[in-house]
Amino acid sequence: MIEGLLGRKIGMTQVFDATGQVIPVTIIEVGPCVVTQIRTKERDGYEAVQIGYQEVKAKSLTRPEQGHLRGAGKLLRHLREFRADNIADHKVGDVLTVEMFTPGQRVDVIGTSKGRGFQGVVKRHGFGGGPRTHGQSDRLRAPGSIGAGTDPGHVLKNTRMAGRMGNQRVTVQNLTVVDVVPERNLLLVRGSIPGAKNGLVMVRRAIKGS
């Protein structure tokens, strides 16, 4: 069995358990994914199953990409590789669905965080800023010292500064599957996941167990 699938973030909502407690959940459209290539140790040096997600028209892909996907029988926008318990269980063209997940199972969700652009240290790192009163004029959100008192003077290593924030790969681990809706390819997981709506995500079995 392959360890994960591709999907897209739909959004957040809430459901109620048997006792009436509110559970915040994220809805993910998972699959259907198509096996596009089998990586073998003899040919590639490692074992993995490559899958594709989200059908597109031919004009959206280059000719080499179209040739690569010819064996799968479908033109797909996103390709990713996952490990599998036994790659012999899969062959090119197989369709994988959300039914591989079950309620109560723990999963890891990998996505790309929202890009925030160039941000200061207060927003990017949670700095407290300078004093608000007693003559302070322009140090409200400044980073403060970045190495004063060093000899020779230099900026200390790993000093947190302003810079580009977000748009990075983020993994959220051990989220609980609340419900699976196979007829609509939907997976409901407890809590939030990284990224914007419609963003590509990878959902895999939790690597740290339940």
From Swiss-Prot:
InterPro entries membership? Ribosomal_uL3, Ribosomal_uL3_bac/org-type, Ribosomal_uL3_CS, Transl_B-barrel_sf
What processes does the entry annotate via GO biological process terms? Answer: translation
Location of the region described as Disordered in the Swiss-Prot/TrEMBL record: 125-151
Looking up Pfam families in the UniProt record yields: Ribosomal_L3
Which GO terms fall under molecular function for this chain's record? rRNA binding; structural constituent of ribosome
Keyword line = Ribonucleoprotein, Ribosomal protein, RNA-binding, rRNA-binding
An annotated GO cellular component: cytosolic large ribosomal subunit
Transmembrane regions = none
Free-text function comment from the UniProt entry: One of the primary rRNA binding proteins, it binds directly near the 3'-end of the 23S rRNA, where it nucleates assembly of the 50S subunit.
Q: Which family does it belong to?
A: Belongs to the universal ribosomal protein uL3 family.
Subunit structure, as described in the record: Part of the 50S ribosomal subunit. Forms a cluster with proteins L14 and L19.
Database matches in HAMAP family: Ribosomal_uL3_B (MF_01325_B)
For this protein, the record's NCBIfam families field holds: L3_bact (TIGR03625)
Q: What is this protein called?
A: Large ribosomal subunit protein uL3
Organism, by scientific name, is Roseiflexus sp. (strain RS-1)
